[in-house]
A protein has these predicted regions:
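Short phosphate/oxyanion-binding micro-motifs
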Residues: 1-66
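Non-catalytic, mobile gating and regulatory segments of ester bond hydrolases
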Residues: 59-253, 257-437
């Protein structure tokens, strides 16, 4: 039986007539197939229709982005795909310069998320999507790990006569073992001036080295050019930029581990009496930041941050695990300080002394899983209510499903922090008078 009239070639194919006949005969026992030998995409598929079979030859290649290219995204980049700021920074925003305004909170959250990407992705996002000016990407040396493991980038609102400078540290990368070594190393470093602080975070900034058991004495002019140290290089970079942009102020920000680095960077500006730099500080924003030091360190920072306008914005989302670490107990004695800008699972914000369940007690075992189920359901419908920009990626949805088993991990996603800033109050005011608990 010949069915050549019932077989249509939809695309060009490299199959010869004989090959096509053999294929169809082998699969279906049919003979007499008419084909043409013309070019192709590759990969053969059979399309069924009533009384008709269509043979389509599609040939192509799997495109794997090259690591370090503009197309190569980190895991975080696949979790959070939003590329645009909530609102472009206007001259009015820059003239008022209110650090608690949503405009600055949003750019801080977005920069903290973007910090997980490579230099080319960051530059493209900043220049093309944010319409800002990319200044530089840094890869800093860690003496303890004996490798470059601390990343940061700097941007300005514009290239000439900038009013805003943003410094963003990279947080903990999901598949980077060195980051977990830093996070889970609960060793102290005792500073006479400021109290005890997390040694691993200090080493990531190039401010300490346990192998020589003393504070780092590096200075910019004596550093190995191939082993740049974060604190010293960024401090000098800010001085240079503020010399060029005399009307500018700066924000330091990050998510996760990077939040701890941002906070310690600020602390060392106080220790080293960098008063001219500190006068230009607009705000420090941390998202899901772990504890950094002991009570003495907290008292030191509170005394330095006592100003009429709040500077320190510590944002915590729901059951995020990382802000509850290292533990605040008799053994570890790590403590947060200042006001916690806490967002619940519905993105409602309130000021607290500390986030609920501060030490991950088993009392919350069932409630946090109920919350995780709610967060999963909410993520599936939020974009219908609030707009397409809140539609989550498949990877983000999968992470929320996994989060029912380990809720604190999925709650740490930058997706939650960007949602919180955009759906929460238009202005944050972390003052003690607003604390509710």
């Amino acid at each position: 039986m010949s069915i050549s009239s019932d077989i249509v070639m939809l695309q060009e194919t490299k199959l010869s007539e004989d090959e096509a006949n053999k294929f169809v005969k082998y699969c279906y026992g049919w003979e007499g197939v008419a084909t043409k030998e013309i070019g192709a995409f590759g990969g053969l598929c059979i399309l069924w229709k009533p009384n008709k079979v269509k043979i389509q030859k599609a040939e192509g290649s799997i495109i794997i982005p090259k690591r370090g290219s503009e197309e190569f995204l980190s895991v975080i980049g696949h979790l959070e795909r939003r590329t645009d700021l909530y609102k472009s920074i206007s001259e009015d925003d820059l003239s008022v310069m209110d650090g608690g305004d949503r405009v600055f909170a949003d750019i801080s959250a977005m920069a903290s998320t973007l910090a997980y990407e490579n230099k080319l992705v960051i530059r493209k996002r900043v220049n093309q999507h944010w319409k800002m000016h990319f200044v530089e990407f840094f890869d800093f040396w860690d003496d303890h790990l004996q490798k470059k493991s601390t990343q940061a980038f700097v941007v300005c609102d514009k290239e000439i006569d900038a009013k805003l400078i943003v410094v963003a540290f990279r947080g903990t990368q999901l598949f980077e073992a060195d980051d977990y070594i830093t996070d889970l190393d609960f060793s102290w470093y005792d500073f006479p001036q400021i109290g005890k602080v997390h040694l691993g975070f200090l080493e990531a900034l190039g401010l300490a080295n346990r192998s020589i058991d003393k504070k780092s004495s590096h200075h910019l002019e004596t550093q190995d050019i191939n082993k740049p140290l974060a604190y010293f290089v960024l401090c000098q970079k800010l001085k240079n930029l503020l010399q060029i942009h005399k009307n500018a102020k700066f924000i330091v920000t990050s998510h996760s581990l990077g939040g701890a680095l941002a906070l310690l960077f600020l602390a060392m500006l106080f220790v080293n009496k960098e008063d001219k730099l500190l006068e230009k500080l607009l705000a420090i924003y941390t998202f899901g930041q772990p504890r950094v030091g002991d009570k003495e360190f907290g008292d030191f920072m509170n005394s330095k941050l006592k100003q009429s306008e709040p500077k320190y914005f510590r944002v915590v989302y729901s059951n995020d695990l990382i802000p509850r670490l290292p533990f605040d107990d008799g053994l570890f004695m790590y403590k947060h300080f200042g006001v916690c800008l806490y967002y619940n699972c519905c993105y409602c914000q309130k000021n607290l002394v500390e986030a609920p369940n501060r030490d991950l007690t088993l009392v919350y075992f069932i409630p946090i899983r109920i919350t995780a189920i709610w967060e999963l359901l909410q993520s599936l419908v939020l974009h219908y209510i609030k707009g397409e920009s809140f539609k989550e990626t498949k990877l983000s949805i999968i992470s929320r499903i996994f989060g029912i088993l380990v809720p604190g991990i999925s709650a740490h996603s930058p997706v939650n922090y960007i949602n919180a800033i955009r759906l929460g109050p238009p202005r944050l005011n972390p003052t003690l008078s607003n604390v509710k608990g």
